[in-house]
Every structure is written in structure tokens, then in C-alpha cells.
């Protein structure tokens, strides 16, 4: 549990098992019991940048649903935003953690933190490959371990 000076925010790893239950962000985000939650999805670089360069364009590619947990991408374009993407690759996953990749991840996490604080969300869900939350859950892109570890570290240190 990470805390800010104003409130406590729970950062919760979530494992996808099957559609229509916990772990399925597309289902969870529609349930009343998750109305105080913000969801982090794995984004591709092109759509991540499209949204961040023009967040006011609900018809743009940065607001279109994607595969896997990016099905909730349109929720980052709603008011208030209920989701935010962290880029995990371009046409395939980032293989290594270079400065460009770090910068994109840092930009995403900063925006997510700002949105969570501004909208008083109590919980943040991110996709994990296990309940211990040590590694990012990925399905479509094959993302390098150091990249996945960096993303999880940044998510977990948002309120430090």
C-alpha cells in the first residue's frame, strides 16, 4: 500500500484467468464495485503517443479499443478517465530497457499518477502474471523481463 499525504491508494496486481470475472479489465471497469478504481493497461507505443499528443480526440487511434487488456483504451478518453496505458512495445514488445523506453514508461506513469490523484481513485489495478505482482502480465507482446520489472517497479513506487 502506497500513501500520499491526502489518502491511501491500493496498488493491486490482477491476473487474467477468463472473461467476465476478476482479472478481465474490460469486465471489471463496468462493475459498480470497481467505480473507485483506475486501471492500467498495456499499450502499444503508437496509440500511447497518439493519445498523449491529442487526448481530446475521442475518435483518434489513442481512444480505440485494442487487444488483451487494451480493450479498455477508450476509458482513458472518458471524463473522468478510468484507465491509462503504459507502452510495452511497437509492433512487438520492447526487448530491452533503453533510455527511450524508460522515458516513455516514466511519462505514462507520471500521467497515471496525476489522473489518480486528481480523480481521487482509491485503487489502481495492473496486469500481473501472478498474484505476487512481481512481473507484468503480458499476452500479445513478448516484452523483455527487465522492461516488465521496470514497469512494475514504477507502478509500485508512484506514491514514494
How would you label these PLM feature ranges?
Residues 2-160:
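Macrodomain-like recognition of ADP-ribose-binding/processing modules
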Amino acid at each position: 500500500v502506497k500513501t500520499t499525504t491526502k489518502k491511501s491508494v491500493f496498488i493491486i496486481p490482477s491476473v487474467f484467468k477468463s472473461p467476465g470475472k476478476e482479472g478481465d479489465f474490460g469486465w471489471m471497469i463496468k462493475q459498480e464495485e470497481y467505480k473507485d478504481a483506475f486501471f492500467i493497461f498495456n499499450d502499444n507505443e503508437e496509440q500511447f503517443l497518439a493519445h498523449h499528443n491529442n487526448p481530446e480526440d475521442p475518435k483518434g487511434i489513442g481512444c480505440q479499443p485494442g487487444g488483451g487488456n487494451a480493450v479498455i483504451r477508450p476509458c482513458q478518453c472518458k471524463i473522468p478517465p478510468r484507465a491509462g496505458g503504459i507502452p510495452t512495445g511497437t509492433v512487438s514488445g520492447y526487448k530491452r530497457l533503453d533510455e527511450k523506453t524508460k522515458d516513455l514508461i516514466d511519462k505514462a506513469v507520471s500521467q497515471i499518477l496525476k489522473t489518480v490523484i486528481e480523480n481521487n481513485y482509491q485503487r489502481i489495478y495492473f496486469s500481473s502474471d501472478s498474484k505476487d505482482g512481481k512481473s507484468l502480465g503480458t499476452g500479445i507482446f513478448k516484452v523483455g523481463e527487465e522492461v516488465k520489472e521496470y514497469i512494475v517497479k514504477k507502478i509500485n513506487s508512484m506514491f514514494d
